[in-house]
């Protein structure tokens, strides 16, 4: 079999399971996951390798109606991700009825003129009749080339999806070394891990007004000559009242966030970690161009 390689964008509405799917395909946690919509803010590249292919995946923020400059960035980022790719994965689930948001997304993808594989997620939670209804609706769209059902959270159907993607890719060499898994730096992954834990521990709308910025990452040896990573991270919120909620009574919320994040960061870095979290208030940061650029958001 000839070697195949290519670029694939995963796109869909917020909270349909795009990051869960990406992590499942790559086999490592490179995108944070949460039940809250709009968890992913940046495009994330993940690289799948096997003996006869290399697939470069781009996970995107969910397409939604933006309410601020951060939202504008996220939606523009998702839209630009379909440029110059070989295949688009359009991911949907059964939990919401097809509405104006879906129709808008379909019109956008149709205009992109690229091969589209529809992925119906959470098939383990729907009946055969429900699956057929979704399948029939999308199979009538001429730009949908193939349809795959799967459950991203338990891995069912992921292998079939990968084989389907391979069938649509051109022959060509690998773009990255075989041990390359993501384009994210350790610093970026650490900040995303902390943000994931904020999403996990904090309810209501507060998480959407939270940014995370790694201020420093330094290694040192302790008295037993064991390497330790000292990491300082700012959790930035928009209101003083939000700061108190994130910290929690007697600091319990922040301690929980820190403990859970530290465990994941230690797995990532394969070393002991001293993680210090600081909660800071910056009003209106989601509409501040300079601040957004400092966090890595670009037009």
Please tell me what each predicted stretch does:
Residues 115, 124-186:
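Canonical P-loop GTPase G-domain recognition
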Residues 59, 121, 151:
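Active-site glycine-centered loops adjacent to acidic/histidine catalytic or metal-binding residues
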Residues 186-299:
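P-loop NTP-binding site
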Residues 28, 47-51, 66, 81, ...:
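Conserved, well-folded catalytic cores of nucleic-acid-processing
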Residues 17, 157, 253:
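Conserved glycine(s) of the Walker
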Residues 49-54, 76-147, 221-224:
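Conserved C-terminal guanine-recognition region of P-loop GTPase G domains, centered on the G4
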Residues 1-84:
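Conserved G1/Walker A P-loop phosphate-binding module
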